[in-house]
């Protein structure tokens, strides 16, 4: 497949990736909620870490020309990860914790999401860079 793909194909990739990402996000969220409960937004944290790791992998796989930028950036980066990751949910979870007066949980949530997601993206990038040398 060439780098020039039709607009219809681009929208189809975004839609397909989005449907898969949203479905997997819901599935993982339910698993984590059943496992760890609702006392802390672990489900949001988990999908954000997985999504950040996957974005790091994707970025380096495209940079190393292992994946096609037009297809995989659209399907996975925009579609799948756009629906899978949950920055808006992370923001709401943090705000609700603050409104409930649970400043410590809110601070921990913010710290964990930011630090672990950046670390996960870096790990994904590092793995591809190391494996492609």
From Swiss-Prot:
Membrane disposition: Multi-pass membrane protein
Top-level taxon: Bacteria
GO cellular-component term (any): plasma membrane
Regulation: Na(+) is not transported, but it plays an essential structural role and its presence is essential for fluoride channel function.
Keyword Cell membrane on entry: yes
Keywords, ordered alphabetically: Cell inner membrane, Cell membrane, Ion channel, Ion transport, Membrane, Metal-binding, Sodium, Transmembrane, Transmembrane helix, Transport
Binding site for Na(+): 82, 85
Signal peptide: none
Any Pfam family hit: CRCB
GO molecular function terms listed in the Swiss-Prot or TrEMBL record: fluoride channel activity; metal ion binding
Transmembrane domains' residue ranges: 4-24, 39-59, 78-98, 108-128
A GO BP entry: cellular detoxification of fluoride
HAMAP family assigned to the protein according to its UniProt record, in alphabetical order: FluC
Role: Fluoride-specific ion channel. Important for reducing fluoride concentration in the cell, thus reducing its toxicity.
Protein name: Fluoride-specific ion channel FluC
Native organism taxonomy: Bacteria, Pseudomonadati, Pseudomonadota, Gammaproteobacteria, Alteromonadales
Gene: fluC
């Amino acid at each position: 497949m060439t780098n020039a793909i039709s607009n219809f194909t681009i929208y189809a990739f975004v839609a397909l990736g989005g449907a898969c990402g949203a479905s997997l996000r819901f599935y993982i969220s339910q698993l984590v909620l059943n496992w760890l409960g609702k006392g802390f937004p672990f489900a949001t944290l988990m999908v954000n870490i997985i999504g950040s790791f996957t974005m790091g992998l994707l970025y380096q796989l495209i940079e190393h020309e292992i994946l096609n930028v037009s297809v995989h950036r659209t399907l996975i980066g925009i579609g799948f990860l756009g629906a899978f990751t949950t920055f808006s949910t992370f923001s709401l979870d943090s705000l609700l914790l603050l409104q409930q007066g649970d400043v410590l949980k809110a601070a921990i949530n913010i710290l964990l999401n930011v630090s672990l997601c950046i670390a996960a993206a870096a790990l994904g990038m590092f793995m591809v860079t190391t494996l492609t040398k």
